[in-house]
Amino acid sequence: MHRFKNILLLHDTSPEHELVLKRAVDLARRNRARLTVVDVIEENSWDSGEIYGSQPFRDLKQFVIKERQEELETAIEPVRQQGLDVRAKLLFGKPFLEIIRQVLRENHDLVIKAAQGEGGLQGMLFGSTAMHLMRKCPCPVWVVKTGGSERYSRIIAALDPDPSDGQRNKLSAKIMDLATSLAKQDQSQLLVVHTWSLYGETIL
């Protein structure tokens, strides 16, 4: 059974990203899926203030775009040589918003990104982009922990089923499918988590 047909991977330049790319390629190959690797340039750093509209800064912006595009192409060239259907795409804007827009435009059925902590208890594993995607992305999001073994001893699947919401149940089923498949592949322990709010708890 091929669970995923159109996978989206968020690229980054960290040394650990090679492991994340390998995971994405392995999954795409097993599912005979198309893989799209994207990088996102945040435009707000370029478009605020009069000075950023000057010719030198426009030239610098074009240089950065060219560099990022070349980095992206270099990263996926070995994958193309293996015969996998893989594309590169550069997006502009706020990362989590552009990823969600890309998912909606191209009907991606899975998003993969590296875990990037940003300090604090919550930031030990998930950065703000991952948290936004897990809350708002309309397809499953696989956040890959880097820096350890290539095989995982524990996998967590966060589900949010709702008897009155068919779309939410469908998304939870897809997440469970992916988590089960990965746990079998790595012979991992699978943990399924769900949180809920008690109606009226704010007035207790």
Name each region found by the language model:
Residues 1-3, 16, 23-26, 66, ...:
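Structural beta-alpha unit
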Residues 110-132:
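Glycine-rich, Arg-bearing micro-motifs that act as flexible, cationic patches
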Residues 56-70:
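A short acidic, glycine-rich active-site loop
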Residues 113-115, 141-146:
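Short beta-strand elements of ligand-binding domains
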Residues 129, 137-138:
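Short, structured coil segments at secondary-structure junctions
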Residues 2-55, 154-204:
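Small/aliphatic-rich secondary-structure junction motif
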Residues 45, 96-98, 120, 150-151, ...:
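Generic structural signal for helix capping and beta-alpha/helix-loop junctions
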